[in-house]
């Protein structure tokens, strides 16, 4: 029997294309949600991660407490995001899933763990000793918890380690470090070396050793970052920046104009919240898009690239 079609505005359609940044090409495929969701309010509206080939999302909407207090599981079927499961877990402040199916989620003040493979995945364990954004490795038993300007905390085998980043400033090389995430086996960060207002990208290994630092300031203190085979990709707000493995600046997309902007790739400017790895030459870009006349909606693009 046909499922009732949910009421509400239709999902926006995007005419995707391709974009050349420096020597590298990016191609986008739009993967629409079956059901339009609406997000609004905070700056980071969407949290997302993957597990066993499915995708888990938190859609924050300050006007919809019920939606904001849930995590939604989707599968990609026929190039669409199809709903699979809903969990009564609030992941609006942080959401990550490790390779064993342990889901980390932060309510306003505490991080809790949930076992997606248990008989009751909505039953939390005890609150962890730390709070902050969560990033989980798919290759090893590792989750990183990060609260702005605090030492990153590595969670491995139930042990917590506060990692000291290499450098002689407040936090590694920086006096403040607004952005951090885990990509592969590296911690990618954006911070301010002094109080000049210029922010730089730096990558560290899991022992805290600096591996790379950007040769020039990046476009925003708040960046979505990903390690790629040929270097590092940063989204700094309507613009993508490419850096070589040692941090040398390569090229960036243009912020405005007719060509060489992200509009050419995705069909419009979108705010990206998360990059999720796929195979070596592809990743998912998860974000949101809105017009002045209506609330934002979540969007997902499959990006294929030689970078």
Question: Model-flagged regions — what are they?
Answer:
Residues 26-39, 80-87, 120-130, 159-172, ...:
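A short beta-strand motif characteristic of beta-propeller blades
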Residues 273-307:
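Blade-level signature of beta-propeller repeat domains, shared across WD40, Kelch, NHL, RCC1
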Residues 54, 101-103, 141-142, 185-187, ...:
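Conserved core beta-strand positions within WD40 beta-propeller blades
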Residues 57, 104-105, 145-146, 188-190, ...:
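Residue position within the beta-strands of beta-propeller blades
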Residues 64-72, 109-114, 149-155, 195-202, ...:
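Structural motif
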Residues 40-49, 89-100, 128-142, 170-182, ...:
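Repeated scaffold domains used in trafficking and secretory/extracellular systems
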Residues 75-79, 115-119, 156-159, 205-209, ...:
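Short loop/turn segments that connect beta-strands within beta-propeller blades
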Residues 1-75, 81, 85-88, 111:
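N-terminal "mature head" segments of proteins
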């Amino acid at each position: 029997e046909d499922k009732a079609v949910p009421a509400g505005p239709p999902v926006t359609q995007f005419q995707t294309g391709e974009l050349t940044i420096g020597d590298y090409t990016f191609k986008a495929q739009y993967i629409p949600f079956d059901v339009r969701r609406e997000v609004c309010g905070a700056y980071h509206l969407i949290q997302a991660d993957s597990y066993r080939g499915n995708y888990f999302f938190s859609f924050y909407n300050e006007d919809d407490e019920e939606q904001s207090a849930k995590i939604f599981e989707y599968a990609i079927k026929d190039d669409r995001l199809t709903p699979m499961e809903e969990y009564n877990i609030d992941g609006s402040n942080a959401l990550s899933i490790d390779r064993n199916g342990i889901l980390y989620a932060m309510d306003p003040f505490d991080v809790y763990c949930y076992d997606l493979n248990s008989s009751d995945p909505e039953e939390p364990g005890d609150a962890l000793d730390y709070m902050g954004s969560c990033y989980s490795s798919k290759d090893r038993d590792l989750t990183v918890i990060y609260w702005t300007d605090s030492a990153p905390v590595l969670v491995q085998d139930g042990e917590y380690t506060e990692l000291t980043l290499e450098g002689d400033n407040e936090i590694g090389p920086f006096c403040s470090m607004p952005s951090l995430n885990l990509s592969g086996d590296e911690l990618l960060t954006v911070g301010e070396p002094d109080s000049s207002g210029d922010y730089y990208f730096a990558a560290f290994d899991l022992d805290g050793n600096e591996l790379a630092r950007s040769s020039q300031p990046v476009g925003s203190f708040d960046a979505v970052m990903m390690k790629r085979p040929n270097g590092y990709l940063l989204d700094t707000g309507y613009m993508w920046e490419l850096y070589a493995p040692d941090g040398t600046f390569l090229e960036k997309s243009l912020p405005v104009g007719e060509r060489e902007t992200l509009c050419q790739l995705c069909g419009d400017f979108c705010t990206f919240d998360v990059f999720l790895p796929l195979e070596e030459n592809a990743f998912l870009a998860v974000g949101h898009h809105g017009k002045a006349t209506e609330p934002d909606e979540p969007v997902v693009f499959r990006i294929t690239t030689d970078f």
